A protein has these predicted regions:
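Glycine-rich phosphate-binding loops of nucleotide-dependent enzymes
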Residues: 1-276
Length: 276
């Protein structure tokens, strides 16, 4: 079983209101999406592939621009701001994208240079300090048991699990207040997957708000505190992961609103009981 630590006092850190986003071809990527996430919480996101998960991540991090709506970070609206402008506001957000070696890391570079990619935006002068990046790379190798011939070996030569540890490790080390992860265990073996779940729970215990986009419903139900379901670029519900069932999530993934899904499945349970 995956651990789900219980956190006390939690405050809303990010509130999304009526977010509508268009794709470059003019079709709708997100339609009137609203939700909030608290500190020390894992909000799972479930949905059939292509329901708006990728666009949600990219809009929250400033890589895509919303057509309407607001993303309130501690009540400050960050819609329309670039990732660099978001950093300048003192907002600490980390993103672990689905495309690890295309968007997350540079495949031909080693760990050290990939650490530098994150830190150079925060550098104060014209010179890049390699020493802290090398120390960080070595620290991650030890802490996360990353298997690599060396910290300068191109990351494309590593296994998928090790690549993901490098990426998530780097993003966590920047001490984010919000951590957005898209399919972080896709293609990983069970041991690597549990390492990732532990890392996410560690962040939760530090008070980080974690958005976890996943495809395995069992994992989503065990790891998340609340679960948001997307269907055809709309939110069909945000529910308590401890009490909702897999069947209810399945109904919501095919378009049933949360209240409707709860009613329908409780009706099925009643008739099943009567048949006994």
């Amino acid at each position: 079983n995956i651990e789900r630590p219980e956190m006390e006092k939690r405050d809303t850190i990010l509130k999304v209101v009526d977010l509508t986003v268009d794709k470059s071809d003019g079709s709708i990527a997100l339609d009137d999406v609203s939700f909030e996430i608290k500190t020390g919480e894992i909000l799972g996101v479930a949905g059939v592939a292509g329901s708006g998960q990728k666009e949600l991540c990219e809009t929250l991090t400033g890589l895509m621009t919303a057509k309407k709506g607001a993303i309130l970070y501690h009540k400050e609206n960050i819609v329309g701001k670039t990732p660099a402008e978001i950093i300048k506001l003192g907002i600490s957000m980390s993103f672990v994208p689905e495309d690890r070696l295309g968007m997350g890391l540079v495949a031909s570079m080693g760990m050290v240079d990939n650490m530098l990619l994150k830190s150079y935006t925060e550098g104060k002068g014209p010179f890049v300090e390699r020493k802290p990046a090398r120390e960080l790379a070595q620290k991650l190798v030890e802490k996360l048991a990353i298997v690599t011939p060396g910290v300068d070996t191109p990351v494309r030569l590593m296994s998928g699990g090790n690549v993901q540890k490098v990426l998530l490790g780097r993003e966590i080390e920047s001490s984010p207040q919000v951590l957005i992860t898209a399919y972080p265990v896709r293609g990983l073996d069970i041991n690597s997957s549990y390492t990732i779940y532990d890392l996410l729970n560690e962040q939760k215990k530090k008070g980080v708000a974690v958005i976890y986009i996943g495809e395995d419903l069992d994992v989503l139900l065990e790891l998340s505190d609340r679960l948001m379901v997307l269907c055809h670029v709309k939110v069909t519900g945000v529910v308590d992961a401890k009490t909702v069932t897999k069947e209810q999530i399945g109904l919501m993934m095919t378009g049933a609103e949360a209240a409707e899904a709860m009613k329908e499945t409780s009706g099925q349970e009643l008739s099943a009981d009567q048949d006994k």
